[in-house]
């Protein structure tokens, strides 16, 4: 049995530091690297890409709405032509930096509000799918497990990977509890690790109301901006490994 463990990295901006990329890259198997629209600057992103290369971690483009002030977590009604161009631009920028770092971009995982919106909004989902296909149809799309987006992308010929979140609470419907609500973000590393082991072993996760939700996922995310991110990721990896689960990416790392 195997499982991918991913994290959102490269999100520091100038003098403003976000997360511990160096530590996380020693734990995760895939890195969702910021592309400059919600966070990240070229020099910092390049450093993260080089560290990913050195650790054999697979790289993905963490594309987002153009929203540095809101960290990409504000909903935006972006026109299709703009959204398609924005996603193409971000993937292209990361591809250039990745090539300079001696690695390559293997997948796309949208960030924040864009991620949540395209999980159910057909128009914006189609825009993101179109952008990926126009840049490189070989790129995998990482999306919320159980969301319609997975089927929409597959219908357009993209490979998809269903994702679950280690440090987020779920609703009984299998969606993420809004960050505005109490208890939306989890912090207890041991509890989170046991939740993820149950997810991998039994295909279920406990929702915020105590009910069990069926989730089929091939990748688990630990948010890099969570203050407990390193401890959570390490505990999840250790617990899964102890149970015989191999932590490896759904893609092959660049040579």
From Swiss-Prot:
InterPro entries associated with the record: Glyco_hydro/deAcase_b/a-brl, LamB/YcsF/PxpA-like
Function noted in UniProt: Catalyzes the cleavage of 5-oxoproline to form L-glutamate coupled to the hydrolysis of ATP to ADP and inorganic phosphate.
The keyword Zinc-finger is assigned to this record: no
PANTHER family per record: 5-OXOPROLINASE SUBUNIT A (PTHR30292:SF0), UNCHARACTERIZED PROTEIN YBGL-RELATED (PTHR30292)
Name of this protein: 5-oxoprolinase subunit A
Record EC number: 3.5.2.9
Subunit note: Forms a complex composed of PxpA, PxpB and PxpC.
GO MF annotations in UniProt: 5-oxoprolinase (ATP-hydrolyzing) activity; ATP binding
GO biological process: carbohydrate metabolic process
Catalyzed chemical reaction(s): 5-oxo-L-proline + ATP + 2 H2O = L-glutamate + ADP + phosphate + H(+)
SUPFAM superfamilies, sorted: Glycoside hydrolase/deacetylase
Keyword Secreted assigned: no
Family to which the UniProt record says this protein belongs: Belongs to the LamB/PxpA family.
Keywords for this protein: ATP-binding, Hydrolase, Nucleotide-binding
